[in-house]
Amino acid sequence: MKTAFVCDSTLQVNEEFCKNYPLSIVPLEVRLDDELYEDNVTITPEEFYKKINSGMKPSTSQPSVGKILEVYENLKAQGFERIVAFTVTSKLSGTYSSFTQASELIEGIDIKIIDTLQVARIVGCAVEKIIKDFSNGNLAYENIEDECHKLLKQQNILVTIENMDFLYAGGRLTKTQFLLSNLLNILPIITIKDGILDVSGKHRGMSKVLTKICEEIKEKDPKSLIILYTTDDLLKKAQDVVAKTFGNIETETIIISPVIGTHGGPRAVGIGYLEYEK
């Protein structure tokens, strides 16, 4: 059966990959004051961070059910008989719910929706591997969901944020945490656990935090790393610590998407790791 794949824009699948495989991206939306943009479509990450640094206030929304339904209908019209869709964690976004609602409004095509319970480019890596393995005949359709969750258990991301204003505004920090962080320059190590944000540690200063992140990751014996960043200076700091800790390890770099940047703000950097070969 002819099979297509769909995912939302926060998973940051490589654009070139989409040109070579039947994968459609549904963009989430970012609002800056009164202007609405499509994530990585009508606004780039660089433009987004420039705007919020100028004082514009960001907010996000999941794609509309109608927009997702249109993607499904277009794939059906192209002759696809099955769709496998991957979404950002349902515990931090309503995207999974929107994908599910849209699937209930179309007939004549089988749709499987997978809640990845993770975020950002590390999920995109798992999605790319699954699609490649399926397309090459190395992964059966009925095993896709199990394989996805297997891969997702072998990866994660650890992020730190210098400016807590956005996390606090989004209700993800208490007032006490917010005040202490700003006063003492205590930065959190934030990761994803069971689909939600989890603080695995707190340290004073960016260099100390990045060192601790790399030490945690080194225990996982990763095959490759992904540095996610918002500014070039934070990227450089992360690269220096990675080189010192890991030496010559395959490392991808990618700027954090506008939707995720809405919550993390303009001063964030993270390191993701994969325990499997891409």
What are these model-derived regions, one by one?
Residues T3-A4, T10-S24, E29-R31, E35, ...:
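Mixed-charge interfacial surface used for oligomerization/domain docking
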